[in-house]
Amino acid sequence: MASLQFSSQFLGSNTKTHSSIISISRSYSPTPFTRFSRKKYESCSMSMNGCDGDFKTPLGTVETRTMTAVLSPAAATERLISAVSELKSQPPSFSSGVVRLQVPIDQQIGAIDWLQAQNEIQPRCFFSRRSDVGRPDLLLDLANENGNGNGNGTVSSDRNLVSVAGIGSAVFFRDLDPFSHDDWRSIRRFLSSTSPLIRAYGGMRFDPNGKIAVEWEPFGAFYFSVPQVEFNEFGGSSMLAATIAWDDELSWTLENAIEALQETMLQVSSVVMKLRNRSLGVSVLSKNHVPTKGAYFPAVEKALEMINQKSSPLNKVVLARNSRIITDTDIDPIAWLAQLQREGHDAYQFCLQPPGAPAFIGNTPERLFQRTQLGVCSEALAATRPRAASSARDMEIERDLLTSPKDDLEFSIVRENIREKLNGICDRVVVKPQKTVRKLARVQHLYSQLAGRLTKEDDEYKILAALHPTPAVCGLPAEEARLLIKEIESFDRGMYAGPIGFFGGEESEFAVGIRSALVEKGLGALIYAGTGIVAGSDPSSEWNELDLKISQFTKSIEYEATTSLQAIN
């Protein structure tokens, strides 16, 4: 990680009248004063790499232009095409900037349904927030303590945003080197609190220093993108938006950006059909685990041996498994994700697919952090039990989970580690509740929320650097656990268990990329899961837990054992 050096950036604001536009929000800055050069990451298929720009030089403008609301995606598409043409005829007089054109739609349409209609245009992304109904809102509690959230920035203006789908890339951020503070500043350069829906969606590798396997190469060490065309689903309404980003210093002019957007807009479909709950229409021909069951048991025993050594500081390590499935036909990753979404209202759903890359999809229950201006919230999630068909049996399992010494140890390690890390970057930390059970569709976990208040928004990078990786996906101490994982695991986790989410000018939110799969045409899918090994862990129980965690993926595909096909090594 780069050293934590922060610099302030002046952002002014201005508004001007624009025909057919009912509101404009903008931040703009003085003329660029320096040019910063760094090693380029080659990619000719996507706009410009924002990491190659001078993060010390503010953009000329960051603005959002909102058109009048319409009734349908078709009308919104027509309105956007017209607005892009108008922008081309009356261009902003800046050498760099970001302009978001957005059209509200007076009906709620699923963002994932819109994405499915776009005929696999790449790059593409999807991020769906989970439902937090029934859980305390610690960010809101902190806001109320400071006067009902007025002026302290702990309440989001987009709290009813349900999910986001995007295609194309107005600007992307990618490199083979680990994500650094400079990279974070490069992303923040394209964002503004006055345009809160301009966001960079993406993720980072679990181990940024590890060797990148071929299936993960297109993702680099990290990958983020501000979509060219974006569909926002809100509670009760929707929005179609287009974003243009340019920087003359990166040889990507406003004219280049508009032409690229117009090409993408020609491919946008306005015919949106709701994805129905139906079979994916594929059968599994073979399934192979890495490690195999025979190799996994000794790996757990080795981890336990280290944990039980008095001279070893290690008290937890998370060992993962990679399950490759080969299917008779290609799996549609968006249709697969839609099935997960129907079951996973209490989880984040995501899809991340750079151009020419497999689709990384997931249905993760775990939040890494959410920042709303100065408020930051994280959570501890650990220990696993299955759900039961009857409520009486389900309560028995819940009581067993709450009273298990082994599970309490695993959970306490996670919670106290996150509390310690937040204490290092926040002026105070609230934990509520200390321990409870969080029930998902197929499993239940021990759970707690933690929240605090940053001294300044620029501390956001510190949150990411401090919290990732959590003990829930790596272990404790983190470095000792990482080294053991590197020694034991024979596959590349890639972005599995890494931070997945978005950076925004007003708000950022990241989930932990667990319960996830990498889907590629002609190659089936790689499904990832992991379990925490602590003193008292049983290899057989941990293996069964891995099967339980991937069941949300495998349940939707009919498995047909075929003896004529060999397992893949």
From Swiss-Prot:
Record-level GO cellular component terms: chloroplast; plastid
Temperature-activity profile: Optimum temperature is 23 degrees Celsius. 90% of maximal activity from 4 to 37 degrees Celsius.
Pathway involvement of the protein, from the record: Siderophore biosynthesis; salicylate biosynthesis
Keyword flag Isomerase: yes
Protein name stated in the entry: Isochorismate synthase 1, chloroplastic
Record GO terms (molecular function): isochorismate synthase activity
Reaction catalysis annotation: chorismate = isochorismate
Task of the protein: Isochorismate synthase involved in the synthesis of salicylic acid (SA) required for both local and systemic acquired resistance (LAR and SAR) while SA synthesized through the phenylalanine ammonium lyase (PAL) pathway seems to potentiate plant cell death. Also involved in phylloquinone (vitamin K1) synthesis. Has no isochorismate pyruvate lyase (IPL) activity.
SUPFAM superfamilies reported in the protein's UniProt record: ADC synthase
Enzyme class: isomerase
Gene inactivation effect: No visible phenotype; due to the redundancy with ICS2. Nevertheless salicylic acid accumulation upon induction is severely impaired. Ics1 and ics2 double mutant is seedling lethal due to photosynthetic lesions induced by the lack of phylloquinone.
Required cofactor(s): Mg(2+)
pH dependence: Optimum pH is 7.5-8.
Family of this protein: Belongs to the isochorismate synthase family.
Residue intervals passing through the bilayer: none
Broad class of the protein's primary localization: plastid
GO biological process, one term: leaf abscission
PANTHER family assigned: ISOCHORISMATE SYNTHASE 1, CHLOROPLASTIC, PTHR47253
Pfam families, A to Z: Chorismate_bind (PF00425)
Subunit structure as annotated in this protein's UniProt entry: Monomer.
Transit peptide stretch: 1-45
